[in-house]
Amino acid sequence: MNVKVEDISSIKKKLSFEISVEAVDTEFSNEYKKLSKTAKIPGFRKGKVPRSVLERQYAGHVEGQVFERLVNETFFKALVDEKINAVSAPEVVDNGPLKPGQAFTYEAEVEVRPDVEAKDYIGLDLKKENFAVEDQDVEDRLQDMLKSRAKVEVSEREVAQAGDIAVIDFEGFVDGEAFAGGKAEGHELELGSNSFIPGFEDQVVGMECGQDKDIEVAFPEDYGNEELAGKPAVFKVRLNQIKERVLPALDEEFAKEAGLESVEDLKIKIRESIEGQERDRIEKDFRERMTDALIEANEFEVPEGMIDSQIDYMLKNLQNRMQAQGMRLEDMGINAESFRQIYREVAAKQVKASLILEAIALQENLKVEEDEIKDKLEEIVETSGAPKEAVMNYYSNDESRRGLVSQMAEEKVVAFLTGKAKIEMVDKEALENAKMTEE
């Protein structure tokens, strides 16, 4: 077998093969011998059918089998011999005739992993949000908790106000005609929730129980029903009843229901929770800004095969999470194909970032040591609450372990780059303004 390798681009190679007559004849001979054992030809016993008879009836089938075997065997051997890091299946772009007694030639193209040499990654100019939890943040979260445990009771008030739950009958009309789906009785509408057509809830505020009222609104231009989008409408509304949410008392009993001893302990817990959530959000945003800067400084092509693999990985993760919640992808209004289209650019960015971080790890000799892996596994056991044996068994799987090590390696590179970066701490508003300027 003779192989010639040519670079088509930085991410694609062409391999030209010439396979000897002997190798071709051996494959044809093996295929016909195998076929002779199973072929049913009138007048011949299995295993006794002459090759000439088989050739007349099965030549096309045998040629296809030999073609597939020769390409697979020679192509993947060439990848090893030539040390080619392929990231996609081969695409045969040309081939000569495949006949017994003749050498066989073919050409195949394959995408390869780009050879990335990272640059301009020391001293990145980055902005990072400076955040501190304010007392008002804690109070707001505390109010949310109280509201989530509120009881809905019939109000003694006769006039509806913002925040009330109005129990209404309504029927909508466009151009004087009732429309499908525009009528309901005993509908509970929280005033101020903005869950109805814009302007509707504001006009219910101030109505008295038992009052009838014509409410004039206009459907939004982007309304889901095209027949109603942008059109003015009149709703005939009757306010039947007013309900309100009664918050529980903020006392020791409430704190104990949340698993804490006092209101002060609850506030401390809430503060810690907010700090943790904000810290995660800020770190995620900071890492995105870092990878954006790295991608901008390091331009290179990314193989379509690597992007496809990343999209498949993202899709599988999403499907698994949704399945665990008893949901399907279609429940989000998308399917696998539309997901691939929507998130292709995101996947390409993730692949680029990963390749750059891997290159930096190699260039800076940043490695994940065995004792670091052990410490990480202990941390996973502690934070997840899962049995140690279960965690160790899961990460004894080669694929799971590689994923963990890859994640740890990226974290090590990010920590290295953070230590070398020029970081300006700014408030949230300044950071958002900077984002708008960059866009």
From Swiss-Prot:
Pfam families: FKBP_C, Trigger_C, Trigger_N. GO terms for molecular function: peptidyl-prolyl cis-trans isomerase activity; protein folding chaperone; ribosome binding. One of its GO terms (cellular component) is cytoplasm. Transmembrane segments: none annotated. Residues 163-248 form the PPIase FKBP-type domain. Gene3D superfamilies: 3.10.50.40, Trigger factor ribosome-binding domain, Trigger factor, C-terminal domain. One of its GO terms (biological process) is 'de novo' cotranslational protein folding. It comes from the Bacteria. Consists of 3 domains; the N-terminus binds the ribosome, the middle domain has PPIase activity, while the C-terminus has intrinsic chaperone activity on its own. Belongs to the FKBP-type PPIase family. Tig subfamily. Involved in protein export. Acts as a chaperone by maintaining the newly synthesized protein in an open conformation. Functions as a peptidyl-prolyl cis-trans isomerase. This is Trigger factor. It comes from Syntrophotalea carbinolica (strain DSM 2380 / NBRC 103641 / GraBd1).
